[in-house]
Amino acid sequence: MQTLKVELGERSYPIHIGEGLLDQPELLTPHIVGRQVAIVSNTTVAPLYLERLTQTLAGYNVLPIVLPDGEAFKNWETLQTIFDGLLTARHDRRTTVIALGGGVIGDMAGFAAACYQRGVNFIQIPTTLLSQVDSSVGGKTGINHPLGKNMVGAFYQPSVVLIDTTSLNTLPERELSAGLAEVIKYGLICDEPFLTWLEEHVDALRGLDQAALTVAIERSCAAKALVVGADERESGVRATLNLGHTFGHAIETHMGYGVWLHGEAVAAGTVMALEMSSRLGWISTQDRDRGIRLFQRAGLPVVPPQDMTEDNFLEHMAIDKKVIDGRLRLVLLRQMGEAVITDDYPKEVLQATLVADYRALVDQLRG
């Protein structure tokens, strides 16, 4: 087992990474404040791991709250289901809410914990690669709004993140690839040697090699923990973690939540960010193509939806958390391994990026 730490003063917390951690109560019980525990999961994950976690928490008053699975249910109505369960079971301010699932469950359970009786204890047990390397670390919680993704939420840190890497053995191939999009992101924005490592090990990662997965998760979490410790509320450097997300969120919103997985949209969105960085002269076309090839090898889409127009993108991108005083800030690459957030770019470069023929670009790479 490896343990990392998110350094936030009195609110610092550990990230435990390893095999079989779901069966080790000593990793959880020090972070549970009372006798009441609510496990929030979904209809896919609960049949696989809920009973196991309940046994690990023997002696506690465990309330299971099982939600429908999917991004389409990351909304106010589903959030109310969590509140209904907590109130009906008379859970008090010393309850602990545990998120057992992927990013959707973690975001909603965390937001519920932040709101319930003005804040109760919260634990993250992420079961997908995407949630293990990204959404479970850093305290971002929330729900989607019909007009924009993750537009309603709060920063609310967990007391511990428990990453049992064996949970990936039941993860569908498409979900695994979606998680790799966020892993690749870390190499692009802050760790070029990690990007090289990923190029060498992407096949092993897709083959669920436990040693390779552990390395990828550790390096991703270490990168995110460092950034969150420096900028918890995304007022500066933390925004660079959103490489590809402005374009990607526009894709998710336009297509309908859940049609494209988050990681799939991030991959296509990151290709657009690479293209724009190249058009600005910040990275070479060879570096752009290097990123595209890695996303392809990870089994991810690298072409945005064909029916999305420039106006579609601009409409959705205007409703983005990085918009300040009406100016759209974008995360781009100054070079491989170095990201910046900026609103200082020619409008025509953004327009050219939005209308670029990505399918022709990919076909050229194949040739």
UniProtKB/Swiss-Prot annotation:
GO cellular component assignments: cytoplasm
Keywords: Amino-acid biosynthesis, Aromatic amino acid biosynthesis, Cobalt, Cytoplasm, Lyase, Metal-binding, NAD, Nucleotide-binding, Zinc
GO terms, biological process: amino acid biosynthetic process; aromatic amino acid family biosynthetic process; chorismate biosynthetic process
EC numbers for this chain: 4.2.3.4
UniProt cross-references to SUPFAM superfamilies, sorted A to Z: Dehydroquinate synthase-like (SSF56796)
Cofactor(s) it depends on: Co(2+); Zn(2+); NAD(+)
Binding site for Zn(2+): E182, H245, H262
Chain positions recorded as NAD(+) binding sites: 69-74, 103-107, 127-128, 140, 149
NCBIfam families recorded: aroB
The protein, known as: 3-dehydroquinate synthase
Natural source organism: Pseudomonas savastanoi pv. phaseolicola (strain 1448A / Race 6)
Protein's gene: aroB
